């Protein structure tokens, strides 16, 4: 099987979280980063015939050097929330055939257009120092009346160094690429 997504289902007192830790090994201070992914819904369950609320996997990010560490970033409260990257299930048009259990009426095809949404956001104005870690997290807690098994797929990440690094790179490239004149 070649198609997989990381997923979470917060329900009752269960709290689920997925994330990653990235280290800045560029040798430069990075001033922005962009995250892109596909939000997929694979199953739904609720207490009625239609969802009573939306289900949300809240996105947050943070850096090492504070209270967040590689050991605790999935539960650390100091991470910075960014709603633009939250994975939110549709709040309407999800008629449920069963409240719970292994029922085919609960299943959704997270690869179909109705249950797959592309998300992208850029965080700028940061100072991600060389050697420091960046923590990215999606957390899913219980949503009253409705829960969805939500996945993160096709994850992409890029980061940009501070402007002075770009200037140095461009000047160096220009010096190499410019033809030399012979007199």
Where are these regions (language model features)?
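A short beta-strand element within beta-rich, extracytoplasmic domains
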Residues: 31-44
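Short coil-to-beta strand junction motifs in C2/discoidin
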Residues: 47-58
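Surface-exposed, low-complexity/disordered Ser/Thr/Gly/Pro/Asn-rich loops and linkers
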Residues: 1-28
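Short, charged juxtamembrane terminal tails flanking transmembrane helices
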Residues: 181-183
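Terminal, low-complexity interaction segments
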Residues: 13, 27, 39-40, 50-51, ...
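Catalytic micro-motifs at enzyme active sites that drive phosphoryl/nucleotidyl and oxygen chemistry
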Residues: 20, 43-46
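Residue-level detector of short, conserved catalytic/binding motifs and their immediate flanks
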Residues: 18-20, 33, 55-57, 134, ...
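A short, hydrophobic C-terminal helix/tail in secreted or cell-surface proteins
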Residues: 162-179
């Amino acid at each position: 099987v070649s198609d997989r997504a990381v997923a979470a289902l917060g329900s009752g007192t269960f709290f689920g979280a997925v994330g990653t830790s990235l280290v800045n090994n560029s040798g430069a201070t990075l001033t922005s980063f962009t995250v892109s992914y596909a939000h997929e819904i694979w199953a739904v369950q609720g207490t009625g015939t239609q969802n009573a609320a939306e289900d949300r996997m809240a996105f947050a990010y943070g850096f090492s050097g504070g209270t967040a560490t590689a050991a605790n970033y999935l539960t650390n409260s100091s991470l910075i929330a960014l709603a633009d990257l939250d994975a939110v299930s549709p709040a309407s048009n999800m008629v449920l055939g069963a409240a719970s259990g292994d029922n085919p009426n609960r299943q959704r095809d997270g690869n179909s257009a109705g249950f797959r949404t592309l998300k992208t956001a850029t965080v700028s104005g940061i100072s991600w120092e060389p050697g420091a870690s960046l923590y990215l997290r999606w957390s899913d807690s219980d949503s009253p009346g409705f829960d969805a098994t939500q996945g993160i797929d096709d994850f992409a990440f890029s980061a940009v160094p501070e402007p002075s690094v770009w200037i140095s790179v461009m000047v160096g490239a220009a010096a190499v690429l410019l033809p030399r004149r012979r007199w």
